[in-house]
Amino acid sequence: MEAGAGGAGSDTKGGGSPATPEDPRSPAKPAAPEDPQMPAQPALPQLPRRPRTLDEDGAPSEDGAAGGSEPAPEDAPAQAAGEAGPVSKAAAGGAPHIGFVGEPPPYAPPDPKAAPLLYPPFPQVPVVLQPAPSALFPPPAQLYPAAPTPPALFSPPAGAAFPFPVYNGPMAGVPGPATVEHRPLPKDYMMESVLVTLFCCLLTGLIAIVYSHEARAALGRGDLAQAEEASRKARSLVLFSLLFGVFVSTSWVIYVVVALYLP
């Protein structure tokens, strides 16, 4: 009796019989209807969301991170659109792929027999020239007879006919005879230098004799350039000495005439 009383007391204290484990295969129990007499709880105000930066757009929302659940449903379409962005842009642009999609076709040289078919020969058209107008005046007669034709370098065989003209000129690649230019040798003006030294001007005459001797020595050793330069200087000094002597002589004559015949 005590045990029964104790068991009943325990049931009354525990709030009924002990709880039996629920079967997961059993259907869910319907929710208890709300009592209309119980006062409704007021809804809590929603706090505004904190503005997020661009780096936080791809990160899961604060509510999902705090609850350990999946990202918010509003972030899922944005993430899906970001993943499909490059593919859709490349597909929409229609730009070809830069790399080779497959192996290039092997190179095959053209068949030499098919060359006449691909490139037909150029047709030979006869060239027709208009006759030249007749000259108004007859051509002048030749003053000198034409030079005789030089003999052929290689005589053709007997009875052979060539369809092309044969020229008996100098062979190509063989240099012709070198033309030698004969220039007159420069003059040393030695005699003129001595005369102007004696009768015109002693100083410039002596310098002219020096250049005349230098020109003669250059001619003796075959240096034509040095001989021409020395000869040109000797000639200039001879002319200067001659003009100076003529000027001095004329001035002396005028002075003598004026001194003798004028009071």
Curated annotation (Swiss-Prot):
GO-annotated cellular components: membrane
Membrane spanning stretches: 190-210, 238-258
UniProt keyword list: Membrane, Transmembrane, Transmembrane helix
Biased segments, Low complexity type: 37-47, 75-86
Membrane topology annotation: Multi-pass membrane protein
A Pfam family of this chain: CD225
Region span, Disordered: 1-107
KW Transmembrane (keyword) present: yes
Localization terms from the record: Membrane
Main location group: membrane
Cysteines engaged in disulfide bonds, as pairs: none
Entry superkingdom: Eukaryota
Entry annotated with the keyword Transmembrane: yes
Composition-biased stretches (Gly residues): 1-17
Family: Belongs to the CD225/Dispanin family.
Protein name: Proline rich transmembrane protein 1B
Originating species: Homo sapiens (Human)
